[in-house]
């Protein structure tokens, strides 16, 4: 649901493209 918190969720392929993961 929220990819930015915690930041480690950025490893998820659905979250990775999000600006907060850049």
From Swiss-Prot:
Domain notes: The cysteine framework is III (CC-C-C-CC).
Keywords: Amidation, Disulfide bond, Hydroxylation, Ion channel impairing toxin, Neurotoxin, Secreted, Toxin, Voltage-gated sodium channel impairing toxin
TM ranges: none
Record protein name field: Mu-conotoxin GIIIB
Positions where Alanine amide occurs in the chain: 22
Pfam families, A to Z: Mu-conotoxin
Tissue and organ distribution: Expressed by the venom duct.
Similarity section: Belongs to the conotoxin M superfamily.
Locations listed in the record: Secreted
Modified positions (4-hydroxyproline) in chain numbering: 6-7, 17
InterPro entries, per the entry: Conotoxin_mu-typ
Disulphide bridges: 3-15, 4-20, 10-21
Lineage: Eukaryota, Metazoa, Spiralia, Lophotrochozoa, Mollusca
Function in brief: Mu-conotoxins block voltage-gated sodium channels (Nav).
Organism: Conus geographus (Geography cone)
Domain of life from the UniProt record: Eukaryota
Gene Ontology CC terms: extracellular region
Location (main, coarse): secreted
GO molecular function, one term: sodium channel inhibitor activity
């Amino acid at each position: 649901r929220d990819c930015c918190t915690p930041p480690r969720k950025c490893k998820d392929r659905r979250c990775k493209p999000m600006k907060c993961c850049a």
